[in-house]
A protein has these predicted regions:
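Compositionally biased, intrinsically disordered or flexible polar/acidic segments
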Residues: 19-180
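Bacterial Sec-dependent N-terminal signal peptides
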Residues: 1-21
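A generic structural signal for alpha->beta connector loops
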Residues: 14-17, 196, 268, 306
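Conserved beta-strand scaffold positions in the cores of enzyme catalytic domains, especially
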Residues: 22, 199-201, 306-309
Length: 414
């Protein structure tokens, strides 16, 4: 696994790292190390035979770069063989869905990847959790994952990108989940935007609005933010479990939401609230409310402070009720024992989404942005199609080649 960059190394990146870097993936490339600054990572280096006849497994390629937004241009396919490739970045952020190419067929795509470390300044860093130290999102490199039944990448170009950024704040329903079969809408959200927008997901499992602030995550965002950037905040799941003095929807939670508003606006950013996703809790075919006053408290703060709201709470209720009590399990981490390597017990989680569920929820977020008339929806990809949670996509057509890292333990939060 990749090591976190130390604060002392943060200032030592060479100027060359800021320029465009192009890699010919048809020839042998080294195994990544910090002194070289690029190479195959995470899994075994492709063999000469694999490069000649084609891969049948996922591979990762990393490039050492400073914090920031990077336009990544990949040419996928091969002149030697037919291929099937999906492209993700960092912690399984989806950019290109599985795409088949014929022998000799090459296709080029561009997208923007946000890369960061915990470093803020010489006196402050993000206080990440122990589990985050193995994440591909907090280290000193930008990592691309090439997956699929026969992944093929011909070339990679990486260059700095000066584009608007959408920052995501939240908990386990938003975070870039690092391991199968867990997923959240934040890591699917990247799929829908062209190379004129960056998505920077700072959410983490188990966080409340208060612990997000206390761990310096908003401070990190503010150091990266430019005037006109966006900040989306989804909280409420874990906040309702706080028991300290002053906790509750109408005091501590509301007060912390106001802190987000004030700090983002002070830095000339645009803040948007997202009401929490529903839990799968049915009675007589209807979803039962489990979040208490927290969604209403968020709405009240938003109304008072003139903050736009994406009603994910309502959309996910419609989504679950449309699927029904049994079929709604398909959107969440419900799997029989033995479904995944090393999984000796059944998984039954009514809060956390699997990849299909997260993909569907990401579409709800985009629809919420469209309904609010946000200018950044002009950067939606040409293949975007409007979505309704009352008409979900066909689960049986979902295709997600598994990343090679699995975990049976639930993410923090419930």
């Amino acid at each position: 696994m990749k090591k976190l960059i130390s604060t002392t190394l943060a200032s030592l990146f060479c100027v060359a790292c800021l320029n465009a870097q192009t890699f010919d993936m048809k020839v042998a490339q080294p195994c990544y190390n910090d002194s070289i600054g690029y190479g195959w990572d995470v899994t075994n280096v492709p063999t000469a035979k694999e490069l000649k006849k084609g891969l049948k497994r996922p591979v990762y390629f990393s490039v050492k770069v400073p914090d920031g937004n990077y336009k990544v241009t990949v040419t996928i396919g091969s002149k030697k063989y037919a291929a099937n490739t999906t492209v993700r970045a960092e912690n399984r952020r989806l950019f290109i869905e599985p795409l088949s190419t014929k022998k000799g067929e090459l296709k080029t795509f561009s997208f923007v990847v946000n890369k960061r470390t915990p470093y803020i300044n010489n006196k402050m860093s993000v206080r990440i959790k122990e589990r985050e130290k193995d994440y591909l999102t907090w280290d000193n490199r930008l990592t691309l994952e090439f997956n699929g039944t026969a992944p093929a990448v011909a070339s990679i170009n990486i260059e700095k990108a000066d584009v608007p950024t959408v920052f995501l704040c939240g908990n386990s329903t938003v975070v870039d989940q690092s391991r199968e079969p867990w997923a959240s809408w934040g890591q699917m959200f990247t799929r829908w935007f062209d190379d004129g927008i960056a998505i920077s997901n700072h959410a983490e499992s188990g966080l409340t609005a208060g612990s997000f602030l206390a761990s310096n995550r908003l401070e990190k965002i503010l150091t990266m933010m430019k005037p006109g950037d966006y900040v989306l905040c989804e909280f409420g799941h874990n906040d309702q479990k706080e028991k300290m003095a002053g906790s509750g929807a109408w005091y501590n939670f509301s007060y912390n939401l106001k802190k987000f508003i004030d700090q983002v606006r002070k830095n000339k950013g645009n803040i948007i609230f997202v009401t929490p996703t529903q839990r799968r809790n049915f009675k007589d075919g209807k979803i039962q409310e489990t979040h208490g006053d927290y969604p209403d408290a968020m709405r009240a703060v938003a109304k008072r402070e003139h903050v736009p709201v994406i009603e994910l709470h309502d959309m996910t209720r419609t989504f679950f009720e449309t699927l029904g009590e049994e079929n709604s399990k398909r959107a969440l981490v419900h799997y029989a024992a033995g479904t995944f390597p090393g999984q000796d017990k059944a998984l039954a989680d009514n809060t956390h989404f699997n990849t299909w569920g997260a993909y569907e929820v990401s579409k709800m977020i985009v629809m919420g942005m469209k309904q609010l008339g946000l200018p950044i929806v002009s950067h939606l990809r040409p293949d975007w199609k409007d979505y309704s949670p009352a008409q979900p996509d066909d689960f049986n057509k979902w295709n997600w080649p598994l990343s090679p890292i699995f975990e049976s333990q639930k993410p923090d939060g419930n």
